[in-house]
């Protein structure tokens, strides 16, 4: 057959397959274009969690893990498992960068400020990493203040009290909790600097709502009607803020939602909001590399391992043109993560990132920037790129709110975009691989509590090939098989590093 051009990799972020259609937004939504694909095209399912994507057994996937594996075309061992193993075998406590951090604080006489998401969700961080770091630092005689970031998004919306109680029970004597802050404020990634400013004010200047202890901070938030994600920055009695000679250690291992708060804390030329006089930090440490700019003022306990010969790099090496498209909420995913942790575009790689709407939560604007993404996708198809990667954020971002009516509207907005894409591809003679990176909006009710379900799932996700070889069949697989499938459609061989295999079987 004639090689299709362009080939579109269309990622429906958070669109899983549920066995309970009554609570599934994709099942309840009117999606004629997705339905057309499922009726008329080869399709299968993908595994997006656990060892199939480089995570511990049973651990749900997420967008970072998903896009990393998609772009790599191989199973990539993720940071969660690496850090868990280091804590288990004791090597974490001998980590060179952590040792240097401790030495600098012993020399300055300062306090170590530890910030991390306190839950067992395992998407951005883990409570056990916070506990291990507190022990490692206090064992060497350095006092610790912990800045608790409450989750409620990758775990049930009102589970923080249990995690705070667990943390308090495990902390060494020389460690205490200084602040309690919902991730809505501390872990923004879309330039909502007014939120980040409030988290910064609490952690660094001890300015926020008062509470006698961390458990009461959570209880007070619940009394105000706030769930864990949205707990307003709260300062625990006795915490007076950071001072010159202190150090700051971010325990989150996922980059995208750590970058903004860390820039406010340490970036020399930071100007997004007025931080006032910042402490002269003796040391700044991250669990991982957060970006090349962060590397200029922070060390990393576990530096990123470069993934070579990704989908984008291989296409670029063949002299072909590619286009990356997503609204700003998913900007890092189709660029940094898909390119194996590389910030800069590949040769011949163009990008367009329309702004996500500035609303408090995305159930208030479930269409998000999908209309603009869809219009730009049609333009890119008509422009003659060889490869286009597009991410629709709606199913995931709206799914995180737990609102089924809003998630239905989100899926319908994405389906309109699918219709526009299919029409443009038919005119251009192109093809598409339509997938999801993990599930979310297909489960809106928590089966255990009966309340809203806001986390990712371990459900299978769809994979569909449009415009592929005549009579082709599709087998089931995992995310590592996506890049080989795309390269197969493009008529390209695989780099030796790609151990995934094409899902396309020919008659």
Swiss-Prot record:
Cofactor section: Mn(2+)
Chain sites annotated for binding substrate: 124, 153-154, 183, 189, 254-257, 330
GO cellular component: cytosol
Keyword field contains Manganese: yes
Active site: 63 (phosphoserine intermediate)
Entry annotated with the keyword Manganese: yes
Cofactor remark: Binds 2 manganese ions per subunit.
Ranges that cross the membrane: none
Positions that bind Mn(2+) 2: 13, 63, 437-438
CDD domains linked: iPGM
Biological processes per GO annotation: glucose catabolic process; glycolytic process
Positions of Mn(2+) 1 binding: 396, 400, 456
Any one GO MF annotation of this record: phosphoglycerate mutase activity
UniProt superkingdom: Bacteria
EC category name: isomerase
Alphabetically ordered keywords of this record: Glycolysis, Isomerase, Manganese, Metal-binding
The protein's annotated pathway: Carbohydrate degradation; glycolysis; pyruvate from D-glyceraldehyde 3-phosphate: step 3/5
Catalytic activity: (2R)-2-phosphoglycerate = (2R)-3-phosphoglycerate
InterPro entries: Alkaline_phosphatase_core_sf, BPG-indep_PGM_N, Metalloenzyme, PGAM_B_sf, Pgm_bpd_ind
Functional note: Catalyzes the interconversion of 2-phosphoglycerate and 3-phosphoglycerate.
PANTHER family per record: 2,3-BISPHOSPHOGLYCERATE-INDEPENDENT PHOSPHOGLYCERATE MUTASE
Assigned protein family: Belongs to the BPG-independent phosphoglycerate mutase family.
NCBIfam families, alphabetized: pgm_bpd_ind
Subunit and interaction comment: Monomer.
Official protein name in the record: 2,3-bisphosphoglycerate-independent phosphoglycerate mutase
Annotated organism of origin: Paracoccus denitrificans (strain Pd 1222)
